[in-house]
Amino acid sequence: MGGFAEAEDLSGVVSDALGKRRRIAGVDRLRGGTKKGVYRIRLDGTGPASLIVYRWADEENFWPGAAGEVTDPFAPVSGLVPFLAARRRLDEVGARVPRVLWTDDTRQRHAADVAVVEDITGGTLEALFDTDPARADAALNDLARTLNLMHRHHAPRYGRVDLLERGGVALGDSCEQLVLDRALRDLDEAAGRDTRIAAARGRLDVRLRALRALVVPRTEYGLIHGELGPDHVLVSAEGHPVLIDVEGLMYFDVEWEHVFLRLRFGERYAALSRPGLDPPRLGLYALAMHLSLVAGPLRLLDGDFPDREFMHAIVEHNLREALALLP
């Protein structure tokens, strides 16, 4: 793992996308990606000063086991096909995503799936909260409208967009059972790695099953990003939110999205909240998500993920939060 692309590797991508008239002036690998490489390419000549290259290469996917079962909404997802399917669906509902300039998944000229997209240079919403709060607040309110469009775009089945687009059927019988089954696996895994979880394992198991028993079935699901934090929202020059890291886009219980939004946006979540969410689902999904954010980062740390201190901090925070949810 961790074999990043060099300027020489990316020059062919730029040449194929833009022609021979543009030359690379510099390359920066952007921080944060765990399933693909994201590179800002600075260019000489006329036209856009920079663009972004997504590179879905095995050596840039830090998750052990790489891609998972496509029918599992929670399995790691990577590649051009789910990216383009997600982008098409977001276009349909009116959510902004970076404009795609060129793609290739043949792996004949390039060793990975690649996409060239426009560079949204206004920074992340997360950064703007510190540097330009007024601009960030306006973008946050616009993001709330975008999420409302997505979450009210319903489907009769849950699952990843690329799977449903092909007529496939997602794993499991219901969102809530899928979440419970995953949470129990995460609990087992985390208990084997951390003594504090191991000590509370029985109580956490009982609590998860009790919360699941309160959930009433439903037959309609909203469109969710799945991992939407302020670091996954860019802000355009016009001040509009632009969603990135969209490969895991799926139809699911919107409560799952809201639990993650509340976790990642903290006190700013109030701008994104909405009435009508199901309290039993929120309770189950909150505990399940905290356990996932203990087990997942611990799994990631088995590899050579570079920002290890950051991952350890995620583990510690979510471990405390999970234990705090015990009665």
Residue ranges of predicted features:
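ATP/Mg2+ or Mg2+-diphosphate-binding catalytic cores
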Residues: 189-199, 293-327
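Short strand-connecting beta-turns/loops that link adjacent beta-strands
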Residues: 45-47, 108, 237-239, 287-290
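Conserved N-terminal boundary motif of the eukaryotic protein kinase catalytic domain
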Residues: 21-28
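An alpha-helical support segment within catalytic cores of ATP-dependent transferases
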Residues: 5-21, 108, 132-141, 145-224, ...
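Active-site Asp-x-Gly
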Residues: 62, 220-224, 229-287
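ATP-binding pocket architecture of kinase catalytic cores
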Residues: 31, 35, 42-166, 170
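Short Gly/Pro-enriched turn/cap motifs at secondary-structure boundaries
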Residues: 28-30, 224
